[in-house]
């Protein structure tokens, strides 16, 4: 499932209005929906929105083995370069990795 579809599904399942969802994400309603309707949003934007809704992204190997690179360093580089989410995901997939979206642990 594409990240935008995941976010829209979360909004629908929680019965949120566009304005409510935007407020949770810390954006104006127009800006929020512009980001989602772009269909190829920036990685930084998607991680910010997912975080606001209580989700996080991890990189996992398709074969289930342990990552052979530092996930934190990868995310720092992705944030610095401000890449498109789908482009970054396509690179990972070509290398045998996937993005996995999961609920953040309760504090």
Feature map (PLM): residue ranges:
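Short, basic-rich loop-to-helix N-cap that marks the start of a DNA-contacting helix
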Residues: 38-51
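Intrinsic low-complexity tandem-repeat regions in disordered proteins
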Residues: 46, 56, 88-89
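Short, charged recognition helix plus adjacent turn
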Residues: 60-107
């Amino acid at each position: 499932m594409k990240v935008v579809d995941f976010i829209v599904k979360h909004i629908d399942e929680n019965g949120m209005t566009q304005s409510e969802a935007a407020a949770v994400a810390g954006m104006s309603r127009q800006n929020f929906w512009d980001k989602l309707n772009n269909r190829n949003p920036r990685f930084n934007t998607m991680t910010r929105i997912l975080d606001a809704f209580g989700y996080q992204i991890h990189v996992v190997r398709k074969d289930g083995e342990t990552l052979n690179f530092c996930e934190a360093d990868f995310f720092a580089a992705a944030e610095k370069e401000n890449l498109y989410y789908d482009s970054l995901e396509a690179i990972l997939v070509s290398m045998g990795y996937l993005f996995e979206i999961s609920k953040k642990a309760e504090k």
